[in-house]
């Protein structure tokens, strides 16, 4: 059976200077919520009190000349204990029709232990947009 690699909730907050802060939240029994993008009712039992902020993993997104938003987590501030790594750097690009996520995880000796393949994972928009 396939198991999700990462179950998270992302909270986006707009800032007065035009940037967007993306905070990463975790939940207990994360695999219980696998597939909630397809079946939102899976989230009905989840309360805000159950969510935990992943300190240091915030991404500040800035609008680029292309119109997409791009940013990354602060190097050395997002802790992980997965796959022999101790720190994770996440790069994120959000455009009107796609999201691209690139992960790089390093050990205490600054050696890359794992990461997204190539240029990262690209998620394409499917379906119609609101109002169409």
Locate each region found by the language model.
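Calycin-type beta-barrel ligand-binding domains and close structural analogs
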Residues: 5-132
């Amino acid at each position: 059976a396939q198991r999700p690699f990462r179950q998270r909730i992302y909270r986006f907050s707009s800032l007065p200077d035009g940037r967007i802060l993306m905070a990463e939240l975790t939940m207990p029994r994360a695999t219980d919520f696998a597939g909630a993008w397809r079946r939102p009712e899976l989230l009905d039992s989840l309360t805000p009190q159950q969510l935990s902020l992943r300190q240091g993993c915030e991404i500040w997104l800035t609008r680029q000349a292309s119109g997409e938003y791009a940013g990354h987590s602060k190097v050395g501030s997002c802790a992980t204990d997965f796959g022999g790594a101790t720190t994770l750097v996440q790069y994120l690009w959000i455009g009107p029709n796609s999201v691209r996520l690139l992960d790089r995880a390093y050990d205490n000796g600054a050696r890359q232990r794992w990461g997204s393949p190539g240029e990262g994972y690209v998620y394409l928009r499917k379906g119609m947009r609101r109002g169409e």
